[in-house]
């Protein structure tokens, strides 16, 4: 990225597991955006007190699309890792409002404002044989389709598998058990095997940041770029350089 052309990145979902790693990566890497703008319900972590962070805190998520389109300077790239769970949201209908509707509205607002690139953390399986029967896959697929239809200079989708990392708490007992099983399995299988179905949040975050940077530098493989699990690992771990 040329230092003569400073860029700004807006991050939605900066307090979640993947989003918090995206934020820390953006703030600590010397080769990323000169300014990082966030929109969130609560203030994001900024342990280094970086002057590059410009947070907007508003608990009313219905205002976020307007807030996004009003950011100054206008971000070159928007990254959304926004998402919740059915348990946390209080049901599928409420989860749909966040995972689908709000992400769709944010993408539309970004396009209308003139944002060049949009990066979305989706999920593996959105195009699988059973995806039309799974509400979670339908949510993510709908957002992907919207981003593609908006025709950004670059639309970038990451489809990670099971996301590993230290959460504040498991959303339900079954989730905690699943993560424990995967962690235990990791002691017996190679990292390459684990990479086929689960990735660390930090790796996903780094892949998102690197993909955004490549788009801004004109190095993305195409204007519509979908990163499946193997490419996430490639960009976020194997080829990652601070």
From Swiss-Prot:
It is found in: Mitochondrion outer membrane. SUPFAM superfamilies: NAD(P)-binding Rossmann-fold domains (SSF51735). Residues 35-58 have a biased composition (Polar residues). This is Protein fmp-52, mitochondrial. GO terms for biological process: import into nucleus. Gene3D superfamilies: NAD(P)-binding Rossmann-like Domain (3.40.50.720). Residues 33-58 are annotated as: Disordered. It comes from Neurospora crassa (strain ATCC 24698 / 74-OR23-1A / CBS 708.71 / DSM 1257 / FGSC 987). It is a peripheral membrane protein. CDD domains: CC3_like_SDR_a (cd05250).
